[in-house]
Amino acid sequence: IEGFSFSPDGRKLLFIAQVKTVKSTADKHPDLPKATGIVVTDLMYKHWDEWVTTAPHPFVADFDGNAISNVKDILEGLPYESPMKPWGGIEQLAWSPESDKVAFTCRMKTGLAYAISTDSDIYEYDVNKGGFINLCKQNAKDSDGKDEMAGYDTNPQYSPDGKYIAWQSMERDGYEADQNRLCVMDRATGEKRFVSKAFESNVDAFLWNKDSRSIYFIGVWHGETQIYNIDLAGNDKLTRLTDGMHDYASLALC
């Protein structure tokens, strides 16, 4: 297990585990048990210092306080990864406040298309019924008139009241250094809006306020990483909360 998260009601467990997605040389040639060579016919065959032989998958299981049961692979039978390699972790998945949905980050591509694309999306898995939907492209257009959300969409977080879900979003496909914006979606209507337009740099780590009416985030501006707040109930007003020649690295509400 590479990461885990308990559901808000404490009755389920979300965890990450590796699933074999690529046949090994021994699988392809059982008559050559000592063979160590690798035949590469397509990308993506390697991440930095490791060969791609498995993919991380998110699993959901019942939890009774002592052990897990009824384990389900959200991406069962699919060659995709969630969280995404090489750096993704449990922050790319999230429980809904009602414990009945799981939002997860996934780039549903393989081979060359996977290697050259940054078009990941946020999906929502129904814990009770099974199956998932794409939250980024479900309506083909977002509220800003773009054809689709074509860049990296990562790190979903539900609002405490369950009415909204937010995530980090890049606009363009294939551009890893694109600006990280903060997207908020109304779960009832599917309407999306980018609430960080007043901030000209990247939205890094973010956190919902307990009242679901604002979002805190950290971002770099002029060489300093400061804490900001976006008032969702006040026309997405941006307020800088800290000042000084120092860097804040994370956020937490007490």
Positions of predicted regions on the chain:
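Hydrophobic, aliphatic-enriched repeat segments that assemble into extended interaction scaffolds
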Residues: 1-19, 96, 101
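Extended surface/linker regions that mediate inter-domain or inter-protein docking
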Residues: 77, 87-96, 104-107
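Hydrophobic beta-strand positions that form the internal "hydrophobic ladder"
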Residues: 10-14, 102, 162-165, 215, ...
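Multi-bladed beta-propeller domains
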Residues: 1-2, 33, 62-89, 114-118, ...
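Terminal RNA-binding accessory module
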Residues: 227
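Residue-level detector of Asp-centered blade-edge/turn motifs that repeat once per structural unit
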Residues: 8-9, 97-98, 160-161, 210-211, ...
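Predominantly five- to eight-bladed beta-propeller fold
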Residues: 15-77, 105-108, 112-123, 180-182, ...
